[in-house]
């Protein structure tokens, strides 16, 4: 009887090294314009779509390095049971393309969870949980997968926290997965976010499906647009 292969030990200070790489990726992404496409669907208990929301917007960097968002056409909505809130859209910008930069690392406890091959890439796996959540703060609770070669994050999966509940209202958030790909073979940017979850509202369970695509990355001042393969 042969013993199984022992999991490889992670490098020292893995979380801090990943956060350093994340800081570089985030700084690079702030030099790029891109398009964000959102599709949000309500589903019934048979999986049929009962209502949808769709929008496209360009995220643009100005010569003064200020970021603006320009809606392409008008959003289309046939949602019947759910109202998308300002917090939902803020999470699309800040949590679902989650970046664990060095200045964010202190907010989180990280636990090494081994290694895993993701789409042919050997990765270290970290569990990431908030140390505490202050009033009004939005954080990430989930897992990240980082390429063993350069510690670039290739996938995150989890949820924006906390759920927002009061006696009169509730704002619930689905579990999601965000996939990243390399830009110019260097920096790892989000290209696709997907969620398919059932939210336990007081009025009843509601299944939702969310797809966010980040495309047409173009470095400010460059003429070419970077295209990715569809996940």
Each model region followed by its residue ranges:
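C-terminal segment of classical bacterial N-terminal signal peptides
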Residues: 1-6
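Structured extracytoplasmic
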Residues: 7-140, 148-154, 159-174, 182-192, ...
């Amino acid at each position: 009887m042969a013993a199984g292969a022992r999991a490889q030990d992670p490098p020292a200070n893995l979380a801090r090294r990943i956060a350093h790489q994340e800081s570089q990726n985030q700084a690079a992404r702030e030099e790029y314009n891109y398009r964000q496409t959102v599709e949000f669907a309500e589903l019934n208990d048979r999986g049929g779509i009962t209502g949808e929301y769709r929008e496209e917007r360009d995220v643009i960097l100005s010569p003064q390095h200020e970021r603006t968002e320009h809606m392409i056409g008008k959003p289309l909505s046939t949602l019947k049971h759910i109202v998308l809130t300002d917090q939902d859209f803020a999470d699309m910008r800040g949590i679902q393309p989650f970046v664990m930069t060095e200045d964010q690392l202190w907010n989180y406890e990280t636990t090494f969870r081994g290694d895993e091959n993701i789409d042919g890439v050997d990765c270290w796996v970290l569990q990431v949980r908030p140390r505490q959540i202050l009033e009004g703060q939005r954080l990430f609770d989930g897992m990240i997968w980082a390429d063993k070669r350069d510690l670039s994050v290739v996938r995150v999966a989890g949820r924006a926290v906390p759920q927002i509940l009061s006696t009169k209202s509730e704002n619930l958030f689905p579990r999601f997965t965000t996939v990243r790909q390399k830009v110019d073979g260097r920096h790892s940017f989000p290209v696709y976010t997907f969620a398919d979850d059932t939210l336990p509202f007081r009025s009843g369970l509601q299944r939702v499906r969310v797809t966010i695509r980040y495309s047409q990355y173009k470095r400010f001042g460059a003429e070419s647009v970077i295209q990715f393969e569809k996940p």
